[in-house]
Amino acid sequence: MFVKTFCAAVNGLEVTTVTVEVSLTRGVLYHLTGLGDAAVKESHDRIAAALLNNGYKFPVADITANLSPADLKKEGSGFDLPLAIAILAVDGKMQADRLAEYMLVGELGLDGQLRPVKGALPIAIKARAEHFKGLIVPKANEHEAAVVDKLDVYGMNNILEVVNFLNGSSSSEPCVVDTRREFYARQYQFDLDFSDVRGQESVKRALEVAAAGGHNLIMIGPPGSGKSMMAKRLPSILPPLSLSESLETTQIHSIAGKIGKGEGLISQRPFRSPHHTISEVALVGGGQSPLPGEISLAHNGVLFADELPEFNKHTLEVLRQPLEDRQITISRAKYTVTYPCSFMFVASMNPCPCGYYGDPTHTCVCTPGQIQRYMNKISGPLLDRIDIQCEIAPVPFKDLSKAAPGETSGQIRERVIKARAIQTERFNEVKGVHCNAQMSERLIRQYAQPDSEGLNILRIAMERLKLSARAYNRILKVARTIADLEGSEQILSSHIAEAIGYRNLDRGDWAERGL
């Protein structure tokens, strides 16, 4: 006898339909072909125990199971369920009439319970594209997969429920998710708000400019000045995720196994804050299985690197290409995958090894040479990709106790959304450019030229402040964003002056002056 069931293999964001073919003849051997990894090859023992513990006997026969296409590597335990169902059907223990209508995915426990798998959302998208009537997944993956419309998704607890459903002896109902209502209901439900931050108005302004133009930003200041506190509130002032952005972001988190039970589409921009001990593989992705790293999990959101100089220098250097290309290609001997990673890079750091350089309330014990060596842990090419460099001084206690609550995140976000709308219209016909931070030199010449007074201020600043040549285009990009926030088509001298103030680390005398 011969039976087929259907499942899927996930490789990066690409999903391939896999046909599980099972043939039964006389004999006692079990053969599994189709380039499966160790987890797939071990499925025989899990399936045999699951069937036995649910009242079935594993067939005493020569069984050949093939995962087609045979040249595609199959990874993970999600093939357990389609293999088990095919074995039961080929042995005559269940009906095979409806197997072609459904895609199956799930790991089997020894007791027959279905355990969650990674990548349920992209698999559901593939099932719809292949015109399957429905998708059967573990109960824990049900909500995640059901965000895909025009596809019936059935969450099952164990293999017996799957058998009864496919035999037509149970009336399981597909999971129904009101995707749009859930998505929009949670968009603005932030736990953190900028109204919690007392003082630091200049830093809030820098973060608003960064959010409005999609600019990468670094904050330099002593411990306790509020760097991390403000960075964590940045997602609350960014433009809300669109449904298409959310779907792409959620797929990445699904592949990484980061979607919890009962969770659907990600409704807020991701905020990822890896520890400074993170490895290169954990940061950019890869490993034995090509899983997305932190930069891809931050796609369409924020990647925050706290205490930037404490990161391994080689680890930081791998950020350079993803920051430029907004995608990462991971190539290994057995696979090549590409993940998107378009994120805002936000970093914080102390100004010196002791942390108190320029702090009026503490004495810095570092020499200029020590400060310079500390700063040299961050390479020029990486700093070149950071548009805004913002210095932070601690808020004095008397000001902290008297300061009235500042603007809410919602008020700031309204201005950011208006500025982004201007940029969307400006770059409507420019492929791959959505905000000012992504402008090329040609686009800078076209859209970011200041008036004569502004150009003169920029020339003087370049000479007197010893600004590096790489700061020139960054200043113009940021000035363009400041003008957009004010609704000005022309970049004025005031916009240039503010943008110049955000290039502190490019000044040649940085280690010889106070904050």
Residue ranges and their predicted role:
Residues M1-I218, S225, S331, A471-Y472, ...:
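Peripheral, non-AAA+ core regions of ATP-driven protein-machinery
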Residues T33, A39-H44, P59, N66-G76, ...:
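Basic, amphipathic alpha-helical bundle interface domains used for macromolecular binding and assembly
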Residues S170-V209, G213, P240-I295:
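P-loop NTPase nucleotide-binding/switch module
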Residues M219-G260, D325:
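Walker A/P-loop
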Residues G221, G285, E307:
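The Walker A (P-loop) glycine that initiates the GxxxxGKT/S ATP-binding motif of P-loop NTPases
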Residues N300, D306-E307, V318:
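Walker B catalytic acidic pair
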